[in-house]
Amino acid sequence: TEKSNDVELHASFTIGRKGGEVITLTDAEGAVHDRITLPEMKTDISFGRSSEDGGLYCYDPPTPFAANGDGFVGYAAAPSFSAEPGFYDSARDLRIIVPEGTQVFYTLDGSEPTQKSTPYDGETLEITATTVIRARTFAEEMVRPSDTLTGTFFIHADHSLPVVSVTVDPDDLWNPKRGMLTVGKGVNKKEGLPFKNTVYRKVKNSGVKYESYVEMYDDAGKRIVSQGADISLNGDYSLDMPQKSFKFRAKSKYGEKTFKAKLFPDRDYEEYKSFVLRNSGNDCMWTRLQDGFQSRLMDLFGITVAHQAWKPYVVYLNGQYWGHMNLRERVDEYMVAQFEGMDLEDADQLDLLEASSRAKNGSNTEYKAMIKKIKAGNPAKKQEDLQYILDNVDVDNYFWFMGFEMFFGNSDIGNFRIYRLNAPGSKWKWLINDLDYGLWNSGFNSPKSYTKKSGMGQLNYDNTIFRKLLTVPEYKDRYLTIYGEIYRKLTTDTMMEVLDELVELIKPEMERHWTRWGPENDKDVISEVPTTAEGAYKYWQKRVERLRNVIRKRPTRLWDFTKKAFGLSNAEMEKYFGPKPPMPPEAI
């Protein structure tokens, strides 16, 4: 590359990172002046000739527009294990295979091996408990250390749920100033949520990402992911829960730019850019499936509006049992691209907005202009105002979104997303996210809350489009038809059947989970939570029964709320929603 008139010029071809390609430099007559065969290339490393001896070297950092600096000749060959990482019924003997001319150093605590770590001298390592082993080779001065070999060996790790092992340098977790899981000094929890001045919240808000290694197994115990990835904290108020949520993103600097695996059996995708291991959010110390349960209810309708898949996992962190967590798609432009059938590489073509209309990707300019114009319009009387909405909004998608939120009675609405492809003719769509407070209170009057003039929910999120469309009889009918379809299908019996299935799925893991986390339950977050393993498990059972009681009562109460909020007669209610269901006698 060269620079001319402040413009960087680049060659018209790219090179692969795997190596083996040949680059030839010729003059205009075709005479060859130089030819090199490329080695495997790592991110942000250049390869070229030394101006001193003409030899070929790798350079770190690259030096465009300047002479190459001190180079190195490559990387040491990586070590290997004598047995595959995975699950074993008894203690396991293990050796590390050392490439000729190298020295291996290894760790057992999740840290990156250095030449100050334990040297490996050919001995047999006896693995008697679940352990993460990390090994790395070192060679002569002009050769860089190898990539780190990471493997988790599970001993007597019997689980009914699939397992994921996460390895992170302990300093990135527990460092007193920058550790992701560090509370820090001087935190007064009595001041209320969110806790102020915690190290973990400062780390999350700074946007810092640490290096991790992820080994993920499917239901059959087959390893489907084994690679490095960025790791960072996920969540807002749920950050103050004892167990934190993690988000992971594949990066080419770790070798793979995506996770090439079918992470969710109910999704067709076989490649992901990112995912989340979620602590169940605000439901962390309650049922641990509230949000996922509602995702599964939406699945009963097919994919009508974008929402996250849900799959419960058992997590190990640096070889230590870390309890149950929920695998979720990460809500970002890549998730939306997959849902819309786009290539992941095209995700940057999407405008993705938060509920407040703040842009997460792309721009919010045209969305805000649209809302302003719709507010000023009168679609009930002016066809052009109605047509403007129809030209810019996927109305059915929006009505399904509103119908699900209204049925569930999400009292904490405000964490949804709005998106569209940034291209002529594209329409805005909605994505449902964060239903921790859906089906939480059978008496929450969502029809009234979502249709009020000041906006939806406690924080009055904009509902201009909804209120305007409801003034048009044809579209009020369309919304009530979609909402009624949701209502008729999600009977108490249907919801109970799905809930029972999910409870039975995670129940075998709950006693062990609460043995790990019950003593760390935080009464400054939720005052009533028990802080013993036995008490926490019984409390989990109590919260599940509370959820059952909500879904017993919700259809009956929602029928009345809907009738009043939309001004419907009994005949109209029966047309859209069927007869009012009686309150079940077992409802408390």
Name each model-derived stretch.
Residues 1-10:
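Intrinsically disordered, low-complexity Pro/Gly/Ser/Thr-rich segments with frequent PxxP/GP/PP motifs
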Residues 9-64, 227-239, 507:
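Conserved beta-structured recognition patch
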Residues 20-22, 33, 42-44, 91-93, ...:
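Extracellular structured ligand-interaction cores
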Residues 23-25, 47, 106, 135, ...:
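Residue-level detector of buried hydrophobic side-chain packing
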Residues 27-28, 108, 317:
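Structural motif
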Residues 39-211, 217-228, 426, 542, ...:
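Short, compositionally stereotyped local motifs that mark structural "simplifiers"
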Residues 64-71, 162-164, 171-186, 190, ...:
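Middle-to-C-terminal accessory/interaction subdomains
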Residues 166, 187-362:
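Conserved ATP-binding subdomain of kinase catalytic cores across diverse folds
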